[in-house]
UniProtKB/Swiss-Prot annotation:
One of its GO terms (cellular component) is cytoplasm. The keyword Membrane applies. This is High frequency lysogenization protein HflD homolog. It is a peripheral membrane protein. It comes from Buchnera aphidicola subsp. Acyrthosiphon pisum (strain APS). Pfam families: DUF489 (PF04356). The gene is hflD. Belongs to the HflD family.
Amino acid sequence: MKKIHLITLSLAGICQSAHLVQQLAYSGKCDSNAFSICLKSILEINPTSFIAIYGNHEKNLIIGLEILLSTLTFSSFSYSYIELIKYISNMMIIEKKLKKSRTAIYSLKNKISVISSEYYLNYNIKNLTRKLGELYLEIISSLGSRIVIKGIKDFLQDHQIQEKIRCLLFSGIRAIVLWKQYGGNQLQLIYFRYFIIKKAKKILYHLKDAT
């Protein structure tokens, strides 16, 4: 079913963002391609298709699909798992607040459009990270419910890592918006959990079989 397919990929986008936040917070680095994909997903305001948001290929969400699968099957129940769920829950709270603020949504769309135009002129990923991080601080953080990130103090105090983490939280919230647009909701994670697990396994199987 196409709806379950898109819901599964949206959830993978959420999980990928949250997982990369954890990587940065504890090691100071994360998968560069996955980060770039998450970053550029924020720029896609009017995508031609769902997968266009994530670089036109499901393989760009492979990390998120693996994290989604391990989360729904409880295969790696640990402090890291609890932390991941907490980040996702907090992003969902912020998405609800954002949805209620037409002013914030309007401002975000306009400013993202400008940032996107600038990025596609010079493809400067560092500049894009800085500008999206600043936009997160300016608009999303001002909504309240700031997300407290756990990790190694030296990494958390690094300005560039802070910017990257803000961008990943931003992309996670973007993925939550997509998830809801395709009919996703929290009860679904309980009642349709089996179907989402099955779909995630199927997508991963085809992706790995193709490589």
